[in-house]
C-alpha cells in the first residue's frame, strides 16, 4: 500500500517558452493547436485536425497526432515533426517547439467504477470525485443499491474498469461495511480493460480506521493507493486528494497501456490529461475571472460533459452514452424520436431519421452535407444537451445525510432526492465547447442549441470555444498559466451575446418589453410577444444599459412580473430576447410547431434562406 502524494511538476521555465504545440486526442478526431509568443503576448496561430487512430487497423494514437500536426506544418511552414516525435526545443524561427502538451479521451478515456457504503452519500461523493478527475463512471456500487453480492461480483468482472475508487464511512465510524466492499471487489478478481498482465489500480478514500483491513485484503493483488477520506465527516466533502491520485494513476497504469500512448508519453514532459479535466479547468477559469456562476458543456463524439461552478462549488458530470458520433444512436434511444423531431422544421420520417443517425454512428468522422442534414444534427445536439444537464442536476445537489439526526436504518432507507442547488436565474454564464458547437457554420446556431438545451433564465452571458481549444489550454495552464490565460481571453473565448429569458409561462398577446440605452447614447425600445424571440444588434465589446419588463408573471431575477435594470454585453450574435417562457414548450400542432421553429431561426438569422425554401416557408 502507498499513501499518495501529489506528483511534482517537471522543471519548466515559462520565460524560455515562445513556441507551444498542444494536441487533444479525441474519440473521433485528433486536434493540434499551435501557439506562439508574438511581441509580449501569447496568441493562437493555426490548427490542424485528423481522424484519431487508436482503433484497428492502426492501433497507434501517434499516427493521428502526426497527421494533425502535419496539417499545422503545411499551414505555417513551421517544422515540428521528426522520426522520434516532436522536435523540442525550438531551433531557430521555423523549426521545433519549446513545449508540447496533450490531452486525451481516445480509446474510451478513463473508465472507472466507484464504490461506497450508502448510495446517496459516500458513493455519490466518490462519483463526484471520479467525474471531477475526468473519468467516465461505468457503475456505482453501494451496500444499499439493491443488488445481491453475486450480482455485484458478476458486474465488476464484466465491466473491466481502468480503475476503482472505493470510499465509505466517516473517520472513526464502523468499518464493517467498508471491509465487506473490499472483500467483494477481491472476490470478483477484476481484470483491467487494457493490459491484462498489470495490476488494477484501486484508490481507497474511506474511513481511515478501515485502512489496515482494506490493505490486508487488497494490497497483494492490486495497485492500492490510500488517500484522505472523501467524507471524513458527513458535513464535509473532500474530493481533491482522490482526484489528484486518479490523475497520477491514469498516467502510470492506464495511458501507458493504451495503443501508442507509450510513445506519446515520451513526446511530452507534462502528464497527459483527460480531455474533460482540461475543459473543466477552463470553465473554472471563467468562473474565477468573472466571479460568476458558470455552466459549461463539452459536447463530444462519444460523451457529453457538463460542468458547473455555482457559488464556488465545482461539479462535473459525464453522460457516457450521449455523444454526436459514436454515441449518437444512444441519444435517439434516450430522448426518443419525438423529442428529436420536435426541433426539425420540415417533414421527416422516423425511419429516415434513424438511418441518418445510424450512418453517423458507423461513419463518425463524416460531416453534414446539406442544410437539412445540419438541422437534424443540431436537433440531436439539443437533446444531448438537455439530457446531459438533467443528469448533471442529479449530482449538483446538497450533500446527503447532513440535514437531520437519523439512525443508520433511516439512512439506508433514504431514497428521496433533493432538487439541485442550481437556480438558473442565478447562472451568469453559459458556455460551450466541442467540435459540433465550435464548428457550427453560424454562431447563432450554437447560441440556439445552448439556449434550447439548457433553457437559461433571467440574464445570462453566452460564450463558446472559438475552434475547440479549451482542453489544450487546460493542460497548458498547469505549467504556463500566463500563456493559457492570454490565449483564452484573446483567441478562445467567443462572446456570443446575452440571453434575456423570463422564467414562467405567459399568454398569447402578452409581451416582454426592454428599454435600452445603446452605446451611442440613443434610446431603443423593443417588444417581443410571448412565444417569440428577437435580436438586438449589440456588437462584441459593446455594453448597453437595459431595463427589462417581463410578460405578466415572468421573472427575470427580481420576482414575478417585476422590472430589472442590468448592463448587458454584446457579442457576435447580439442580445437575444427570448420570450418563449420557461419551461420552453413547443406547440402540439405539427404545422404550428414548424412555423414557430422557422420564425425563431429567422429572428436570429440562424440558417440560410435555402432552408426555408426547402421547408416551403
Model-derived features: positions:
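Basic, amphipathic N-terminal segments
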Residues: 335-339, 354-362, 366, 376, ...
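Glycine-rich phosphate-binding loop of actin/hexokinase-like ATP-binding domains
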Residues: 34, 41-53, 281-354, 441-464
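Nucleotide/phosphate-binding catalytic cleft detector across ATP-hydrolyzing
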Residues: 1-22, 35-43, 49-293, 373-382, ...
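Charged, amphipathic alpha-helical linkers/stalks
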Residues: 339-360, 481-487, 498, 509
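Conserved nucleotide-sensing/catalytic segment adjacent to the nucleotide-binding pocket
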Residues: 368-372
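Mobile, glycine-rich extracellular loop/lid and propeptide segments
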Residues: 27-32
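An acidic- and aromatic-residue-enriched active-site/binding cleft used to recognize and process polar
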Residues: 26, 142-143, 169, 207, ...
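Short, well-ordered loop/turn and helix-capping segments at boundaries between secondary-structure elements
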Residues: 312, 324, 328, 346, ...
Amino acid at each position: 500500500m502507498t499513501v499518495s502524494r501529489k506528483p511534482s511538476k517537471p522543471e519548466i521555465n515559462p520565460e524560455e517558452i515562445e513556441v507551444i504545440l498542444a494536441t487533444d486526442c479525441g474519440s473521433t478526431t485528433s486536434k493540434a493547436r499551435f501557439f506562439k509568443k508574438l511581441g509580449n503576448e501569447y496568441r493562437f496561430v493555426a490548427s490542424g485536425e485528423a481522424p484519431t487512430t487508436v482503433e484497428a487497423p492502426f492501433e497507434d494514437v501517434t499516427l493521428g497526432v502526426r497527421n494533425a500536426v502535419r496539417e499545422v506544418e503545411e499551414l505555417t511552414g513551421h517544422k515540428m515533426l521528426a522520426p522520434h516525435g516532436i522536435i523540442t526545443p525550438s531551433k531557430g524561427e521555423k523549426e521545433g517547439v519549446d513545449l508540447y502538451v496533450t490531452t486525451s479521451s481516445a480509446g474510451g478515456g478513463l473508465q472507472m467504477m466507484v464504490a461506497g457504503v450508502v448510495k446517496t452519500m459516500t458513493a455519490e461523493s466518490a462519483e463526484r470525485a471520479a467525474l471531477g478527475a475526468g473519468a467516465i463512471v461505468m457503475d456505482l456500487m453501494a451496500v444499499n443499491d439493491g443488488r445481491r453480492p453475486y450480482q455485484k461480483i458478476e458486474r465488476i468482472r464484466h465491466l473491466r474498469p481502468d480503475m476503482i475508487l472505493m470510499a465509505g464511512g466517516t473517520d472513526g465510524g464502523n468499518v464493517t461495511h467498508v471491509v465487506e466492499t473490499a472483500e467483494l471487489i477481491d472476490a470478483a478478481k477484476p481484470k483491467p480493460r487494457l493490459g491484462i498482465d498489470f495490476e488494477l489500480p484501486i484508490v481507497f478514500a474511506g474511513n481511515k480506521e478501515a485502512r489496515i483491513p482494506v490493505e490486508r485484503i487488497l494490497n497483494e493483488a492490486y495497485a492500492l493507493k490510500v488517500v484522505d477520506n472523501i467524507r471524513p465527516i458527513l458535513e464535509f466533502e473532500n474530493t481533491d486528494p482522490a482526484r489528484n491520485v486518479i490523475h497520477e494513476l491514469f498516467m502510470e497504469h492506464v495511458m501507458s497501456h493504451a495503443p501508442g500512448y507509450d510513445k506519446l508519453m515520451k513526446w511530452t514532459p507534462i502528464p497527459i490529461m483527460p480531455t474533460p479535466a482540461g475543459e473543466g479547468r477552463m470553465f473554472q477559469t471563467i468562473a474565477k475571472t468573472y466571479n460568476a456562476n458558470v455552466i459549461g458543456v463539452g459536447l463530444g463524439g462519444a460523451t457529453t460533459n457538463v460542468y458547473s461552478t455555482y457559488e464556488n462549488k465545482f461539479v462535473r458530470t459525464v453522460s457516457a452514452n450521449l455523444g454526436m458520433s459514436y454515441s449518437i444512436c444512444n441519444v435517439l434511444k434516450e430522448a426518443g424520436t419525438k423529442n428529436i423531431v420536435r426541433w426539425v422544421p420540415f417533414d421527416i420520417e422516423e425511419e429516415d431519421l434513424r438511418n441518418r443517425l445510424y450512418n453517423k454512428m458507423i461513419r463518425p468522422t463524416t460531416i453534414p452535407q446539406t442544410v437539412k442534414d445540419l438541422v437534424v444534427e443540431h436537433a440531436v445536439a439539443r437533446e444531448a444537451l438537455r439530457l446531459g444537464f438533467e443528469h448533471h442536476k442529479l449530482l449538483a445537489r446538497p450533500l446527503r445525510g447532513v440535514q437531520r439526526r437519523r439512525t443508520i436504518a433511516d439512512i439506508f432507507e433514504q431514497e428521496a432526492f433533493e432538487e439541485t442547488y442550481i437556480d438558473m436565474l442565478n447562472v451568469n454564464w453559459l458556455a460551450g465547447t466541442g467540435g459540433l458547437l465550435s464548428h457550427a457554420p453560424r454562431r447563432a446556431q450554437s447560441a440556439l442549441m445552448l439556449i434550447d438545451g439548457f433553457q437559461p433564465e433571467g440574464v445570462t452571458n453566452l460564450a463558446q470555444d472559438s475552434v475547440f481549444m479549451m482542453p489544450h489550454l487546460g493542460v497548458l495552464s498547469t505549467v504556463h498559466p500566463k500563456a493559457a490565460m492570454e490565449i483564452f481571453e484573446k483567441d478562445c473565448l467567443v462572446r456570443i451575446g446575452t440571453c434575456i429569458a423570463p422564467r414562467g409561462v405567459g399568454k398569447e398577446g402578452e409581451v416582454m418589453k426592454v428599454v435600452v440605452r445603446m452605446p451611442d447614447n440613443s434610446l431603443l425600445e423593443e417588444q417581443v410577444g410571448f412565444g417569440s424571440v428577437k435580436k438586438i444588434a449589440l456588437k462584441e465589446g459593446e455594453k448597453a444599459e437595459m431595463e427589462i419588463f417581463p410578460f405578466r408573471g415572468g421573472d427575470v431575477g427580481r420576482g414575478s412580473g417585476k422590472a430589472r435594470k442590468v448592463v448587458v454585453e454584446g457579442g457576435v450574435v447580439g442580445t437575444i430576447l427570448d420570450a418563449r417562457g420557461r419551461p420552453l414548450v413547443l406547440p402540439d400542432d405539427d404545422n404550428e410547431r414548424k412555423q414557430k421553429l422557422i420564425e425563431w431561426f429567422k429572428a436570429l438569422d440562424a440558417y440560410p434562406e435555402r432552408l426555408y425554401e426547402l421547408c416551403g416557408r
